[in-house]
């Protein structure tokens, strides 16, 4: 789709097809913004804009679960760590927080907790500031700081140990003897230090930082710790990571006090609440005082105080159920459209983009905005040369809310004529039934789509080939050094024996740069199965669903063989995939269609012969219910459906939604219904709630 005006979106009235279009669009936008924010330290939009984008995605996915894997940002945390830093695997995942934007969201947060825990009162909640900085994890072993890392993608972060040590107030030893003790917090720069730092940058002729958060992130992620040491970095800690002493604190309130006693910097402006009224009152007071604070905050955080309740509540794949961030509202800006261009995505979607006179809204410079589709341009009568209003609050991207008609120059404003053919290959554009996005169907020959697919293949979430950015990919394609993905891995050999114009002789490349690129390409030949599957850019297969497929097929050979059988209408494989929660019908259909195209099969065959694709390794395979598919049906007396599902997942089980031949166990509550009958017919093991609880306790 080319447009996403959420002021006209009523989620309750969305059809599945329309919802799919929106989620398709969100995947592209979120991926672009993640790259800019986490990896480049150069955000294209504000946190508020991004939050609403992701929030809309999550709400649609909640209503249409089968769309969860059209884009996997409902499952995503952070961004892939930079290849410039060594990697650190988090012993305990660093999840992001779910976001709330109104009182109703916070009220729903409390209600969900009550339903999950089966209680009728609000548990005690700690209310804290949400510091706008860079998240970090610091590990102490027997009281000595041994490792520090950024959040990264939540599972793997960047090693910033030496850089963190340059923050003078950060303890490098603790008066404890625990084998492992990890603290988590936020690195930031005060507003005053930020202004001074930018003055220094300007005097040195260096680029200015757009806001304190980016200054902090850029400073702690320096390759040279000596540079970091010159920056006025500060920090707050507010949580634990992996610990061997699980009795260090029993509540969040106690934890903050004990961390302060250990001489960590802890923001002391927190309260303990047990009702919605005081929680909102805290938010309102903080919002009033926000501009008087020495540092940037972008909201408040509510956390269930009792750690035992936190453990019961658990987490989704991206965020804990026991916490939520109540974000501050966003702002409005006005600027001029200088041009409207078209971009072609890897699936052929043709999207108009408005180029703007750069405008700074809440510290973030915005220079373009997606117009989504032809209908938006026409309905809002948007023209090149118009002054437009950018609205952030409640919108999913830097959205053009409307045209300032009073400022329109009728002599110079220019209507944008949406083309009927692809701007890349001149193929006729089509709008599929139920969609508003115009698409180019020439996927195998359209250079724009080939370019986007190659960019996706080498991206950090896929094969992560550092040094092969978009400009270089475009250069290689334009000059026929490569034609397709496979050619990337032939680049070094062809450069030696085939190309008359060697890459190292081209301006802007150089021998060191080229050799480093070849080294990175060779390193990328060793890839794990789920990243290989994701890199293929199969429609509806995001990072999360790629992991599910890798877990199912285990090896590249089996993935290909089973997918080819699927393409030949193997019903058993199709049924198995559609019944995997998180895969489903849409992904199974697209996997089948992908392998029905001979060019795709040829591509994969060549890649398999070039790459070393590691078999799937699941860290939870040693859990007691690993590889078991369990289905729950009916209502349960002692625990909620959500909690009983979490119990199973913590033990390594895969929770299914339908009973099939792949089901290992059915757990029945009251009013079990048709699933019980089907399980009996298939001879599947059946236990009741009491038996389940007994089994879990014994495990």
Swiss-Prot record:
The keyword Ligase applies. InterPro entries: BRCT_dom, BRCT_dom_sf, DisA/LigA_HHH, DNA_ligase, DNA_ligase_AS, DNA_ligase_CS, DNAligase_adenylation, DNAligase_N. The active site is at 130 (n6-amp-lysine intermediate). Residues 620-699 form the BRCT domain. NAD(+) binds at residues 47-51, 96-97, 128, 151, 186, 303, 327. One of its GO terms (molecular function) is metal ion binding. GO terms for biological process: DNA repair; DNA replication. Keywords: DNA damage, DNA repair, DNA replication, Ligase, Magnesium, Manganese, Metal-binding, NAD, Zinc. Coiled coil: none annotated. Its cofactor is Mg(2+); Mn(2+). It catalyses: NAD(+) + (deoxyribonucleotide)n-3'-hydroxyl + 5'-phospho-(deoxyribonucleotide)m = (deoxyribonucleotide)n+m + AMP + beta-nicotinamide D-nucleotide. Zn(2+) binds at residues 422, 425, 440, 446. Its EC number is 6.5.1.2. It comes from the Bacteria. Pfam families: BRCT, DNA_ligase_aden, DNA_ligase_OB, DNA_ligase_ZBD, HHH_2. DNA ligase that catalyzes the formation of phosphodiester linkages between 5'-phosphoryl and 3'-hydroxyl groups in double-stranded DNA using NAD as a coenzyme and as the energy source for the reaction. It is essential for DNA replication and repair of damaged DNA. Belongs to the NAD-dependent DNA ligase family. LigA subfamily. HAMAP family: DNA_ligase_A. This is DNA ligase. The lineage of its organism: Bacteria, Pseudomonadati, Pseudomonadota, Alphaproteobacteria, Rickettsiales.
């Amino acid at each position: 789709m080319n447009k996403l005006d959420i002021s006209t979106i009523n989620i309750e009235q969305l059809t599945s097809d329309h919802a799919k279009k929106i989620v398709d669009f969100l995947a592209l936008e979120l991926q672009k913004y993640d790259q800019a924010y986490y990896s480049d330290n150069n955000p294209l939009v504000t946190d508020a804009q991004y939050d609403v984008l992701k929030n809309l995605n999550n709400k649609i996915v909640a209503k249409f679960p089968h769309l969860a894997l059209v884009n996997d940002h409902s499952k995503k945390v952070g961004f892939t760590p930079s290849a410039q830093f060594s990697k650190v695997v988090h012993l305990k995942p660093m999840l992001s927080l779910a976001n709330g934007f109104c009182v109703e969201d916070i009220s729903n947060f409390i209600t969900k907790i009550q339903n999950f825990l089966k209680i009728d009162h609000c548990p005690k909640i700690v209310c804290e500031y949400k510091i706008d900085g860079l998240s970090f994890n610091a590990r102490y072993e027997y009281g000595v700081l041994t490792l520090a890392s950024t959040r990264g993608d939540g599972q793997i972060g960047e090693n910033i140990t030496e850089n963190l040590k340059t923050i003078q107030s950060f303890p490098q030893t603790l008066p404890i003897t625990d084998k492992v003790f990890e603290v988590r917090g936020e690195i930031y720069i005060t507003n005053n230090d930020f202004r001074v730092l930018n003055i220094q940058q300007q005097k040195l002729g260096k680029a200015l930082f757009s806001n304190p958060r980016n200054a902090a992130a850029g400073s702690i992620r320096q390759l040279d710790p000596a540079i970091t040491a010159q920056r006025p970095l500060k920090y707050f800690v507010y949580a634990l990571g992996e610990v061997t002493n699980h009795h260090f604190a029993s509540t969040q309130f106690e934890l903050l006090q004990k961390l302060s006693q250990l001489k960590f910097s802890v923001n002391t402006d927190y309260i303990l609440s047990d009702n919605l009224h005081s929680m909102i009152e805290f938010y309102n007071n903080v919002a009033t005082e926000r501009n008087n604070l020495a540092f940037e905050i972008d909201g408040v955080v509510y956390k269930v105080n009792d750690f035992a309740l936190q453990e019961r509540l658990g987490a989704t794949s991206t965020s804990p159920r026991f916490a939520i961030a109540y974000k501050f509202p966003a702002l409005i800006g006005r600027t001029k459209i200088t041009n409207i261009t078209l971009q072609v995505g890897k699936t052929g979607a043709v999207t108009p983009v408005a180029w703007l006179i750069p405008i700074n809204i809440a510290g973030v410079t915005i220079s373009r905005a997606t117009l989504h589709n032809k209908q938006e341009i026409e309905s809002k009568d948007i023209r090149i040369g118009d002054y437009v209003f950018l609205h952030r609050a409640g919108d999913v991207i830097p959205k053009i809310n409307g045209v300032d008609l009073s400022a329109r120059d009728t002599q110079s404003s220019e209507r944008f004529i949406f083309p009927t053919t692809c701007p890349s290959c001149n193929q006729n554009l089509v709008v599929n039934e139920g969609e508003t996005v115009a698409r180019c169907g020439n996927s195998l020959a359209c250079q724009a789509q080939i370019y986007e697919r190659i960019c996706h293949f080498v991206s950090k979430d896929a094969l992560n080939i550092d040094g092969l950015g978009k400009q270089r990919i475009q250069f290689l394609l334009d000059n026929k050094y490569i034609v397709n993905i496979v050619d990337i891995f032939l680049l070094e050999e062809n450069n030696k024996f085939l190309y008359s114009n060697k890459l190292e002789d081209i301006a802007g490349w150089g021998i060191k740069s080229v050799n480093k690129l070849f080294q990175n390409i060779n390193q990328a030949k060793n890839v794990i199965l789920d990243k290989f599957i994701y890199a293929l850019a199969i429609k509806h297969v995001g990072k999360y669903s790629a992991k599910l497929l890798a877990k199912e097929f285990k090896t590249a050979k089996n993935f290909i063989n089973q997918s080819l059988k699927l393409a030949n209408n193997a019903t058993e494989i199709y049924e198995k995939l559609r019944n995997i929660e998180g895969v489903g019908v849409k992904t199974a259909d697209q996997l089948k269609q992908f392998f029905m195209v001979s060019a795709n099969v040829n591509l994969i065959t060549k890649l398999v012969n070039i790459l070393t694709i590691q078999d799937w390794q699941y860290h939870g395979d040693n859990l007691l219910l690993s590889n078991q598919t369990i289905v729950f049906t009916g209502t349960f007396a002692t625990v909620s459906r959500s909690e009983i599902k979490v119990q199973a997942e913590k033990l390594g089980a895969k929770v299914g939604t339908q009973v099939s031949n792949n089901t290992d166990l059915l757990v029945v509550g009251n009013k079990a219904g048709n699933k019980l009958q089907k399980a009996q017919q298939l001879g599947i093991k059946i236990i009741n709630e009491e038996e389940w609880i007994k089994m879990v306790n014994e495990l």
